[in-house]
Amino acid sequence: MKRVHYTDSYLLVPQHPVTVNLIGGGGTGSQVLTNLARLDVTLRALGHPGLFVTLYDPDIVTEANIGRQLFGYSDLGLNKANCLITRINNFFGNDWKAMPALYPSNMKDVRQEHLANITITCTDNI
């Protein structure tokens, strides 16, 4: 049978949590973040080291975000990345990281700390 997909063995049997950069914490990004947290719980229950997610988003929560994204009125004026990561960390007991900034758009500007095993973009503009 022809192999269609390839998964690096490091992702299947890692020694450390798989690092994930999630770029954007709006409508799609907030949902993806929540599901990554649920996936992390499942992976850990199966003996996998789980995930370590860094969320990048420079935006703040506005009234237009309420209802369309996973934010409430108490979140108004807060940075989206800080707000969402704090909520996830408190709920699931994680130590994931918020970066209230844009992800570097030029690869030569990317420092080691910005690299991850998986990068997911959830933005509507660049």
Question: What spans do the regions from the language model cover?
Answer:
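Adenine nucleotide-associated cytosolic modules
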Residues: 1-126
